[in-house]
Amino acid sequence: MATARTAERHGPLTGVRVVELAGIGPGPFAAMLLADLGADVVRVDRPGGAALGIDPARDLTNRNKRSVVVDLKSPDGPARVLGLAERADILIEGYRPGVAERLGVGPETCHARNPRLVYGRMTGWGQDGPLAPRAGHDIAYIAVTGTLGMIGDPDGPPAVPANLLGDYAGGSLYLVVGVLAALHHARATGTGQVVDAAIVDGTAHLSTMIHGMLAAGGWQDRRGSNLLDGGCPYYGTYETADGRYMAVGALEPRFYAEFLTLLGLEDHADTRTDVTRWGELREAVAARFKSRTRDEWTAVFEGSDACVAPVLSLREAPHHPHLAARSTFTDHAGLTQPAPAPRFSATPTAVRTGPARPGADTAAVARDWDLPALLQDENPHRKACQ
């Protein structure tokens, strides 16, 4: 595992200014991605901190950012944010539709100050539609897109994939793609725009290939009945003798043949395409994996093309030899964390700073962004009472 260091070049987005109106989930992660790529991300924290109550020193989604504290409900709070928006390339907010407008920092108000601004809106349901004003979380968003119903054992309830599928894959990544595409347009035309990134849209979009297979008759619309959803005995997970698991993805004929050879099940070579015998094959594979521990099977498949890997825990993953060799994880200030991704040959990225502490960077941002109003106390009475 590598140790984070400050690179001479901070990434391909060096020079891009981003304002993040503090929230939870996909918005902060999207802003972290931009910060990892070198953007100067200023997080506007609210007094009292975020609702999740995570120790700010360990909130890794705030790494590589700077923080100021602004009370948007104070008389001069909106003006301070508008001052930042006037100097920014991108603004990200994750409020319910209409909230930013009521706070005085909606897109029309921001664009009046900065017509080139890319205004990114991150929500679950989107800016319009019957559910737009309703509360929700990742699990509800992915439920209505059909993607949650694809995951899990056919004889049990849908499996909950943490909040990676909806919040981050269907949300954060699409917001980042959207604001960067809009930034490209703004720099070419001088005109900014609003990016409506909805988790329901992004998650549905992720299933495009599956919908094509469904239309072609190559996908059954029931969980655990298909090649890639656990229905196939040579694409799934198997328990080992020590209660751990191995992941198998031996789809292609030559990978399948090597898989069977290393398992000692060569007599099942003709079972690969015979769906009627998949149950028999699954039982045979499961029995073989139960005969040894996970680490023993890892050694058996080491160096092969059988497409088999151990299922690791979060704490185990940084120590995997391949990930360690690539420095997939890094350490900064004693916190082990995934390193920025992807990688760039000419503009390398790095974990430059740890999680931003609320309000700790106000003076530096006021100086660098030429916004001295940030240094003025919003509520002198509150300060006197402290």
Predicted regions and their residues:
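N-terminal helix-loop segment corresponding to the beta1-alpha1 unit
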Residues: 1-178, 182-191, 353-357, 361-386
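Oxidoreductase and adenylate-handling cofactor-binding alpha/beta cores
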Residues: 171-192, 205, 209-217, 260-266
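Glycine-/small-residue-rich "gating" segment that lines the acyl/pantetheine channel
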Residues: 149-163, 218-233
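Aromatic-enriched alpha-helical interface/lid elements that frame and gate functional surfaces
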Residues: 229, 234-304, 308, 375-377, ...
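Short, surface-exposed loop/helix-turn segments at secondary-structure junctions
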Residues: 214-225, 320-330
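Glycine-rich beta-alpha junction loops
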Residues: 125-126, 199-204, 242-244, 250-255, ...
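Beta-strand segments within the central parallel beta-sheet cores of soluble alpha/beta enzyme folds
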Residues: 192-200
